[in-house]
UniProtKB/Swiss-Prot annotation:
The gene is Vps25. SUPFAM superfamilies: Winged helix' DNA-binding domain. Pfam families: ESCRT-II (PF05871). This is Vacuolar protein-sorting-associated protein 25. InterPro entries: ESCRT-II_cplx_Vps25-sub, ESCRT-II_cplx_Vps25-sub_N, WH-like_DNA-bd_sf, WH_DNA-bd_sf. One of its GO terms (molecular function) is structural molecule activity. One of its GO terms (cellular component) is ESCRT II complex. It comes from Drosophila melanogaster (Fruit fly). Keywords: Cytoplasm, Endosome, Membrane, Protein transport, Transport. One of its GO terms (biological process) is epithelial structure maintenance. The lineage of its organism: Eukaryota, Metazoa, Ecdysozoa, Arthropoda, Hexapoda. Disruption phenotype: Vps25 mutant cells exhibit multivesicular body sorting defects, with large amounts of ubiquitinated proteins detected on endosomes. This leads to activation of signals (through Notch and Dpp receptors) that drive cell proliferation, non-autonomous overgrowth, loss of epithelial organization, and render cells sensitive to apoptosis. Vps25 mutant cells display accumulation of autophagosomes. Bicoid mRNA is mislocalized in developing eggs. Belongs to the VPS25 family. Component of the ESCRT-II complex (endosomal sorting complex required for transport II), which is required for multivesicular body (MVB) formation and sorting of endosomal cargo proteins into MVBs. The MVB pathway mediates delivery of transmembrane proteins into the lumen of the lysosome for degradation. The ESCRT-II complex is probably involved in the recruitment of the ESCRT-III complex. Seems to function as a tumor suppressor by regulating Notch trafficking, hence preventing non-autonomous overproliferation. May be involved in the regulation of autophagy.
Length: 174
């Protein structure tokens, strides 16, 4: 895996402090949300813990700067508003983060199903997320919990039906 390319802002000490000026803060949060999504995709991660203060995402060792939990929550709040994250606990300490929104994941999967003629067939979540037929697609490698959430949205729209057997999930597309 290639080394992650940090944006120039990552080497700018004030970037690690929540900015008081509204316009500056909004720009700062936009850069941070983009950085979170790119970094998590690069590292193939879908969950974040606010307590993970040693992650390079939260801590620039060279600058000796670290994101405050307040700033991390502000960033995750922005990701939540844009449909790219959801808290996994009531204390909002553990988060599931999506490289694409759940709706985008659902649409990508449904487009693939239609393009490959798999309507009215049953697929396993493994086939969709990790199968050789999807290795070239943006949703390849998606976390099963994220995929399941995206498929639930498709199910609400009547495009599929989730099937659970012995703790495993399958899905039939319409």
């Amino acid at each position: 895996m290639a080394e992650f390319q940090w944006p120039w802002e990552y080497t700018f000490p004030p970037f690690f402090t929540l900015q008081p000026h509204e316009e500056t803060r909004q720009q700062q949060l936009k850069v941070w949300t983009d950085l979170f999504l790119k970094y998590l995709r690069h590292t193939n991660r879908f969950t974040l813990s606010i307590g993970d203060q040693n992650s390079p995402l939260f801590h620039n060792e060279a600058l000796k700067r670290r994101l405050s939990p307040e700033l991390v929550l502000a960033i995750l709040g922005e990701l939540e508003r844009s449909g790219h994250a959801n808290p996994l606990d009531k204390r909002r300490q553990e988060w599931q983060v999506y490289w694409f929104t759940l709706e985008e994941y659902g649409n990508m999967v449904y487009d693939w199903v239609q393009e490959t003629g798999q309507t009215n067939t049953i697929c396993t979540l493994y086939e969709i997320a990790s199968g050789e037929n999807t290795s070239h697609l943006d949703f390849y490698g998606v976390d099963e919990a994220v995929l399941l959430s995206a498929l639930r949205l498709l199910e609400e729209k009547g495009r599929c039906e989730l099937i659970e057997m012995d703790g495993s999930h399958g899905v039939k597309f319409f």
